[in-house]
Amino acid sequence: SSSFLIINKVSGTIVDLLYSPISPGEATTAIILAAVTRGFLVAIVSLPIFYFLADIEIRNYYALIFYTFISSFILGAAGMIVGIIMSKFEGIAAVNGFLIVPLTMISGTFYTIDKLPEFLQLASKCNPFFFMISGFRYSFLEIEEFDGSIFVGVIYLTILAVGLWLGAYLLYKKGYKIKS
């Protein structure tokens, strides 16, 4: 989403999107759902490779579909916000390097959070990537990080997705850094 917007801003073709006969809500939703589509395409291509390389089994298809959708939606909405705010690709790289990658690394991807000190466990439970990773882990292993973590993750990530959509919508509707 961010690359799409930056490319259009830099090339000057963002006006085609701004003055198209669709509402800001429709444009926001379309841009984010394009990211969701890319997320599902990556999953569809990756799963056969995973099956070939490792002995994996999907134990909860509903969780896999939900977490693929919600994770792609959140990252697409966040990407749209970054694409609206930033004016160059360096800004996207900075957000990726200083926010996305560190949050991913401290999300419990490579370890379970019960190995961490208590205060870091609490901090991990505020990290949306923790709930995304936990949801995917549950899809394949049906293991929860803590009792009710899947339910908490569904609620937390849904609220975050709605909030990010709203933020992207408001920035796009206002034309922040794209109507100048």
Task: Describe every region a protein language model picked out.
Residues S1-I22:
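Transmembrane helix boundary and interhelical loop/hinge segments in multi-pass membrane proteins
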Residues S3, I7, Y51, D55, ...:
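Transmembrane helix-loop junction
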Residues F4, T13, L47-P48, I81, ...:
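A residue-level signal for alpha-helical anchor/packing sites in multi-pass solute transporters
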Residues P21, V82, I106:
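Residue-level signature of catalytic and energy-coupling elements of molecular machines
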Residues P24-N96, F146-Y169:
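Alpha-helical transmembrane segments and their short interhelical loops
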Residues A54, S107-V162:
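Membrane-interfacial helix-loop-helix junctions in multi-pass membrane proteins
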Residues F69, V95-I106, A123-C126:
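Hydrophobic transmembrane alpha-helices
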Residues Y172-S180:
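Short cytosolic juxtamembrane segments of multi-pass membrane proteins
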